[in-house]
């Protein structure tokens, strides 16, 4: 019999995850504080509360923006653990500071359940195309027992080891992402200032040795000033970078490029580009170059 999966958080990442699982024949029950019309239209079953998911599902996954949100849906009056279930596996797909993950894990285990630290990486379109990467960590037994669920969410779910390893890998990955986006903006601004054709730059540089996935995704957006629809808002990058910096500082690892990137993303919060796609960071680079795109 197919597993019942509870999914809390049906936003830009959660909704395509739900659709992927439903397409693989998994019965997905979801909870979101706002409307769940798209989820229902995809074949999902709405739940009245996180507690209801804890009572009826074989496994519960959370994909939420902050530790406060995760704590509320797990430990609140109508939270998952209010169900009183023992042995329930909970997979947190959120990107949170490691100390917060550890704190949440301790509370989950005290309630007799198991938490997997399994942040997901990728923009919504990547997730919808089954190309989002899940960095799974925690109990290998729980991962193996629920491999079908992980494989239903994406074609790229990796088990990395002990709890917390997933978040560490996500921080390393996102360090690259933040730097690659800014590097793409800097290089393209240089090319524009040198009089190179915009479309030709995108066409020639995308398959070149200097390319990256972020260049391939965002160079066309930068050159067309197309910052909507939003794949990932600049404000989200600005929110997450302090976590990466703290992680590196705690390890005594200098990250000069990340610090420069952080300055740009922080500046962007005070601009009209804060809630536009992070490709709009090129506007600040252009401003520093005293040029118009």
Question: How should each PLM-predicted stretch be described?
Answer:
Residues 1-63, 88, 94, 124:
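NAD(P)+-binding Rossmann beta1-loop-alpha1 motif at the extreme N-terminus of oxidoreductases
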Residues 5, 96-175:
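Rossmann-fold dinucleotide-binding core
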Residues 50-62, 67-113:
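Rossmann-fold NAD(P) dinucleotide-binding segment
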Residues 129-137, 158, 163-194, 204-217, ...:
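Active-site-proximal catalytic alpha-helix in oxidoreductases
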Residues 167, 176, 213-274:
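Interdomain hinge/lid region at the active-site interface
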Residues 271-293:
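NAD(P)-dependent dehydrogenase/reductase Rossmann-like domain
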């Amino acid at each position: 019999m197919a597993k019942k999966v509870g999914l809390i958080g049906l936003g830009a990442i959660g909704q395509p995850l739900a659709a992927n699982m439903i397409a693989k024949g998994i019965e997905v029950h979801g909870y979101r504080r706002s409307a769940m019309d798209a989820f229902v239209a995809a074949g999902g079953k709405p739940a009245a509360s996180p507690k209801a998911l804890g009572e009826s599902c074989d496994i519960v996954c959370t994909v939420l923006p902050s530790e406060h949100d995760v704590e509320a849906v797990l430990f609140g009056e109508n939270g998952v653990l209010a169900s009183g279930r023992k042995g329930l596996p909970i997979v947190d797909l959120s990107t949170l500071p490691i100390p917060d993950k550890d704190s949440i894990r301790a509370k989950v285990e005290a309630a007799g359940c198991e938490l997997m630290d399994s942040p997901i990486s990728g923009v919504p379109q990547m997730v919808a195309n089954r190309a989002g990467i899940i960095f799974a960590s925690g109990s290998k037994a729980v991962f193996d027992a629920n491999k079908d669920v992980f494989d239903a969410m994406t074609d790229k779910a990796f088990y990395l080891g002990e709890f917390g390893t997933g978040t560490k890998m996500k921080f390393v990955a996102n360090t690259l992402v933040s730097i690659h986006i800014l590097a793409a903006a800097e290089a393209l601004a240089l090319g524009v200032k040198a009089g190179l054709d915009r479309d030709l730059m995108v066409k020639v540089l995308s398959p070149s040795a200097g390319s990256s996935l972020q260049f391939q995704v965002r160079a066309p957006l930068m050159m067309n000033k197309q910052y909507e629809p939003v794949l990932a808002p600049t404000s989200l990058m600005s929110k997450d970078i302090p976590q990466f910096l703290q992680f590196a500082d705690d390890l005594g690892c200098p990250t000069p490029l990340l610090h420069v990137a952080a300055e740009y993303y922080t500046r962007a919060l005070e601009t009209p580009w804060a809630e536009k796609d992070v490709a709009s960071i090129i506007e600040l680079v252009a401003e520093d170059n005293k040029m118009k795109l």
